[in-house]
């Protein structure tokens, strides 16, 4: 029997000619090895009418899949209306121009188990911030690792590949349409990242191989967002505008801990080459240790990995070694 993840909704939107092909995206979610409780497609109430929807799409509606109508919020329509309508749910956002691998939901939910309370994405970039400014968006490195990556600050989830947002992961301003339309009208990924940062929600990225089965739907790329508004430095400019509106984000980008990502949980990796890893890891060893302690009631295996990382930096730490001994006893039971 197929596992259903209660309290988890897949949410997306579509527009224009893509309405005729979005059924392919929906079918790919309905065929998942593990299913969400609901799939919600949001449509612009001014552009579309229920009675005019393609039969291939409307025939899919039922217990699992629903179509809702709302105000046009551009790309934000895939998540913001769901946050407003179902505030206690967790969400997986996807795009309307892909057919997704059959285990997308399963992989994201496994990531959510491994990284409790984190935003989990199939693909991500490292936001490059140096010398008090953002580097051009094309320089933000795409993570292409064979293992998961985890970071408190520097990873940008890429919405097109699937992103899991646990309930309560985003700041209360997330649904403020006037704010996001004024500073980042074409960069929902950046806005949601900033809202996660303001709420101090970390990000985990799955191995790149997990999303390699994505397939672009024919004819959907003619007006893709990345080919229009976000070409070149469009994202960089909008990121600057977000930070200008929320200057409380600056301490995150300027933090010594900002450029650290955890990959194999055996070592910290620094995203710039200018300073040694040891200096950065040493500066946040207490944060690593406390994160392990907070997680121990929910995922003792992840706590053990994090505490081993802290031990590499501080091998004589009495609390670290005591906790590792405690974890080993519990795991062997």
Go through the PLM ranges and name each one.
Residues 1-31:
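N-proximal low-complexity "stem/linker" segments adjacent to membrane-targeting elements
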Residues 3-6, 21-24, 179-277:
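C-terminal catalytic/acceptor-binding lobe
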Residues 25-37, 45, 59:
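Short, acidic, metal-binding catalytic loop of nucleotide-sugar glycosyltransferases
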Residues 42-89:
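Active-site-proximal specificity loops/subdomain of glycosyltransferases
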Residues 89-99:
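Short beta-strand-to-loop acidic/aromatic patch adjacent to the donor-nucleotide binding site
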Residues 99-179:
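Conserved catalytic core of nucleotide-sugar-dependent glycosyltransferases
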């Amino acid at each position: 029997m197929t596992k259903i993840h209660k309290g988890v909704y897949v949410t997306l939107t579509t527009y224009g000619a893509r309405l005729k092909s979005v059924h392919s995206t929906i079918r790919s979610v309905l065929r998942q090895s593990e299913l969400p409780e609901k799939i919600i497609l949001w449509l612009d109430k001014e552009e579309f009418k229920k009675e005019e929807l393609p039969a291939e799409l409307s025939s899919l509606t039922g217990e699992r899949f629903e179509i809702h109508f709302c105000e046009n919020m551009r790309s934000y329509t895939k998540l913001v209306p769901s946050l407003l309508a179902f505030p206690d749910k967790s969400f997986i956002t996807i795009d309307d121009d892909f057919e997704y691998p059959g285990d997308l939901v399963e992989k994201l939910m496994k990531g959510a188990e491994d990284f409790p309370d984190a935003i989990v994405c199939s693909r991500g970039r490292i936001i490059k911030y140096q010398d008090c400014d953002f580097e051009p968006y094309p320089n933000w490195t795409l993570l292409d690792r064979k293992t998961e990556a985890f970071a408190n600050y520097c990873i940008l989830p890429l919405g097109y590949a699937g992103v899991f947002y646990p309930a309560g992961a985003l700041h209360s301003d997330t649904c403020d349409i006037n704010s996001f339309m004024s500073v980042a009208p074409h960069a929902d990924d950046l806005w949601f990242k900033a809202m996660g940062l303001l709420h101090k929600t970390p990000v985990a990225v799955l191995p790149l191989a997990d999303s390699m089965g994505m397939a672009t739907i024919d004819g959907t790329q003619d007006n893709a967002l990345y080919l229009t508004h976000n070409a070149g430095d469009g994202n960089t400019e909008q990121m600057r505008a977000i930070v200008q509106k929320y200057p409380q984000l600056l301490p995150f980008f300027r933090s010594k801990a900002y450029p650290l990502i955890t990959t194999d949980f055996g070592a910290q990796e620094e995203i710039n080459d200018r300073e040694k890893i040891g200096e950065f890891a040493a500066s946040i060893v207490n944060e690593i240790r406390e994160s392990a302690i907070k997680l121990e009631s929910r995922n003792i295996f992840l706590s053990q990995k994090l505490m081993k990382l802290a031990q590499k930096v501080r091998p004589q730490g009495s609390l670290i070694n005591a906790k590792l001994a405690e974890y080993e006893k519990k795991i062997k039971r």
